[in-house]
C-alpha cells in the first residue's frame, strides 16, 4: 500500500463518542487518538513505529499469549507487537524519514501563512475600541431593558376594539407609538435626569407655521385611546436618545445649534432603531416587560398612525432583526444615524462628516474583525440601507404627526418636548 501523507488514519468523527474516555486497544492506557489505523496511546504508537522501521523480530519467552497492560507492556515485546497488529495497526501508515521531513515543512509553511494572514487581517485600533466601549456604556446608561419606568406613564387604554384590528390606508387614525407625545407632568418628571436635555434647550428655534393642505384629513378622536400612553413613552424615549447622543465621541465638539438640529432630525429614527431590541417577529409586536406594555400594530393605530407608516415600520423592524446585529454594531449604527452631515440646517457639515467617518470606519473594521461569515457578508451595506429606510419612515412620520398635532384635542396630550422636537422639524 502506498504511504499516506499522515502518520495517523482518522475515521469519521461520528464513529466514536467524544464524551466516552478513549482506551488504548493494546495496553488499556489512555488513548490519544487513532494512530496507524487504531486507537492507541502515545507509548504503543511509538513502539509500533520503531518496531516496524527496525523490522524487529521478537520472541515471547512464555506461551505467546501474554496479557498486555499499562504496567507490563514492556515485559513482552513480541506479544505487544502482536496485539498492535491484531487491533488493526498497519505499517503502511508509517511515514518514511523523507515524508516526515516534508510533513514538518508543510506544517511550518502553514503556520507562516497563517501568521501572515493574521498580520494582514484588520484589527480594531485602541481608539476604535475606546469608541465602541463609550457607545456601549452610553447605551446601557440610557436604555433600561427592564422597562421599569413605563409604570410612570399614563396607563395604556386599548378600548373595546380587538387587538388584531388594523387601520386602513389613509385612515384618519395615525398612531404615535413612535410619533411622540407625553403629558407635561411626565415630561417635567424626566427632564431632571442628568442624561437628558431640557426641552427649553430647543426653545430658541421657531415653531413651524405650516398648515395642513389636505382638508380631507380628519381624526376620529374616539379611536385614539393609546395616544396618552404612547405619547409619554415617546417623550421618555426622546430624552434617552438625547442622553445617548451627548456621549457620542465628538458630539459635544459641535455647536449647540448643530447638536439641536441633529437631535431633532434623528430622534424618531433612533427611537425606531432602539425599539428593535424589544421587537419580536413571532407576533410582530414590541414587548416591554409586562403584558400591559406589549404593543401590537393595533396599538400604534390607536395612537393616530395609518398603514402608510405602520407597514414599512414593521418591514423595517423585521429586516433589522434578521441582520442579527451585535450590540456593538447596533450602538455604532445609532451613533452614525445621529451624526449625519446631510441633515437640513446643519452649520458645520465638514466637522459632522469627520465624526461620522470615524464612526463608520469603526463599524466597518468591527464587522471585518468580529462578525463571522456568513452574517458579515455585505452587512455594512445592509446597515447603511437601513438608515435610508429610516429617512423614508421619518418623512412619513412627519406628515402623519402634523395631521395629528393640528387637532387641539390631540396636541393637548403632547408634552412640551414632543412639541418642540416633532412640531418644529426642519424640512
UniProtKB/Swiss-Prot annotation:
Residue segments, region Hinge: 97-126
Record PTM text: Ubiquitinated by UBR5, leading to its degradation: UBR5 specifically recognizes and binds ligand-bound VDR when it is not associated with coactivators (NCOAs). In presence of NCOAs, the UBR5-degron is not accessible, preventing its ubiquitination and degradation.
Organism from which the protein derives: Sus scrofa (Pig)
Feature: compositional bias, Low complexity: 168-193
Quaternary structure, from the entry: Homodimer in the absence of bound vitamin D3. Heterodimer with RXRA after vitamin D3 binding. Interacts with MED1, NCOA1, NCOA2, NCOA3 and NCOA6 coactivators, leading to a strong increase of transcription of target genes. Interacts with the corepressor NCOR1. Interacts with SNW1. Interacts with IRX4, the interaction does not affect its transactivation activity. Interacts with CRY1. Interacts with CRY2 in a ligand-dependent manner.
Protein keywords: Cytoplasm, DNA-binding, Metal-binding, Nucleus, Receptor, Transcription, Transcription regulation, Ubl conjugation, Zinc, Zinc-finger
Higher taxonomy: Eukaryota, Metazoa, Chordata, Craniata, Vertebrata
GO biological process terms held by the UniProt record: apoptotic process involved in mammary gland involution; calcium ion transport; cell differentiation; cell morphogenesis; decidualization; intestinal absorption; intracellular calcium ion homeostasis; intracellular receptor signaling pathway
Disordered as annotated region, ranges: 149-201
Residue ranges of domain NR LBD in the record: 127-423
Residue ranges of the TM segments: none
Name of this chain's protein: Vitamin D3 receptor
Cellular component terms (Gene Ontology): chromatin; cytosol; nucleoplasm; nucleus; receptor complex; RNA polymerase II transcription regulator complex
Molecular functions per Gene Ontology: bile acid nuclear receptor activity; calcitriol binding; lithocholic acid binding; nuclear receptor activity; nuclear retinoid X receptor binding; nuclear steroid receptor activity; RNA polymerase II cis-regulatory region sequence-specific DNA binding; vitamin D response element binding
Location within or outside the cell: Nucleus; Cytoplasm
Gene encoding the protein: VDR
Amino acid at each position: 500500500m502506498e504511504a499516506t501523507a499522515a502518520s495517523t488514519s482518522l475515521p469519521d468523527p461520528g464513529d466514536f463518542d467524544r464524551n466516552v474516555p478513549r482506551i488504548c486497544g493494546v495496553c488499556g492506557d489512555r488513548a490519544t487518538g487513532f494512530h496507524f489505523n487504531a486507537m492507541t496511546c502515545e507509548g504503543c504508537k511509538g513502539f509500533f513505529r520503531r518496531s516496524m522501521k527496525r523490522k524487529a523480530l521478537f520472541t515471547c519467552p512464555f506461551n505467546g499469549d501474554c496479557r498486555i497492560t499499562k504496567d507490563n507492556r514492556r515485559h513482552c515485546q513480541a506479544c505487544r507487537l502482536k496485539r498492535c497488529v491484531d487491533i488493526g495497526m498497519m505499517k503502511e501508515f508509517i511515514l518514511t524519514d523523507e515524508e516526515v521531513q516534508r510533513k514538518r515543512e508543510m506544517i511550518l509553511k502553514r503556520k507562516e501563512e497563517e501568521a501572515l494572514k493574521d498580520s494582514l487581517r484588520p484589527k480594531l485600533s485602541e481608539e476604535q475600541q475606546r469608541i465602541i466601549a463609550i457607545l456601549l456604556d452610553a447605551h446601557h446608561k440610557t436604555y433600561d431593558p427592564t422597562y421599569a419606568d413605563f409604570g410612570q406613564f399614563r396607563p395604556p387604554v386599548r378600548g373595546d376594539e380587538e387587538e388584531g384590528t388594523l387601520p386602513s390606508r389613509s385612515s384618519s387614525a395615525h398612531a404615535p407609538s413612535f410619533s411622540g407625545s407625553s403629558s407635561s407632568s411626565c415630561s417635567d418628571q424626566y427632564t431632571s435626569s442628568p442624561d437628558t436635555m431640557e426641552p427649553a434647550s430647543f426653545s430658541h428655534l421657531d415653531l413651524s407655521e405650516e398648515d395642513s393642505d389636505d382638508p380631507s384629513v380628519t381624526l376620529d378622536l374616539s379611536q385614539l385611546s393609546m395616544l396618552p400612553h404612547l405619547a409619554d413613552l415617546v417623550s421618555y424615549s426622546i430624552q434617552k436618545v438625547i442622553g445617548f447622543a451627548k456621549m457620542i465621541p465628538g458630539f459635544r465638539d459641535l455647536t449647540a445649534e448643530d447638536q439641536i438640529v441633529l437631535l431633532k432630525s434623528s430622534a424618531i429614527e433612533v427611537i425606531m432603531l432602539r425599539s428593535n431590541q424589544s421587537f419580536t417577529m413571532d407576533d410582530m409586536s414590541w414587548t416591554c416587560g409586562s403584558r400591559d406594555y406589549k404593543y401590537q400594530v393595533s396599538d400604534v393605530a390607536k395612537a393616530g398612525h395609518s398603514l402608510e407608516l405602520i407597514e414599512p415600520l414593521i418591514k423595517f423592524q423585521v429586516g433589522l432583526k434578521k441582520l442579527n446585529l451585535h450590540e456593538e454594531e447596533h450602538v455604532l449604527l445609532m451613533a452614525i444615524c445621529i451624526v449625519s452631515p446631510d441633515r437640513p440646517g446643519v452649520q458645520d457639515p465638514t466637522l459632522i462628516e469627520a465624526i461620522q467617518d470615524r464612526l463608520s470606519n469603526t463599524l466597518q473594521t468591527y464587522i471585518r474583525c468580529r462578525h463571522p461569515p456568513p452574517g458579515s457578508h455585505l452587512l455594512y451595506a445592509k446597515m447603511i440601507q437601513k438608515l435610508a429606510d429610516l429617512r423614508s419612515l421619518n418623512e412619513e412620520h412627519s406628515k402623519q404627526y402634523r395631521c395629528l398635532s393640528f387637532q387641539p384635542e390631540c396636541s393637548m396630550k403632547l408634552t412640551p418636548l414632543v412639541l418642540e422636537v416633532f412640531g418644529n422639524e426642519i424640512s
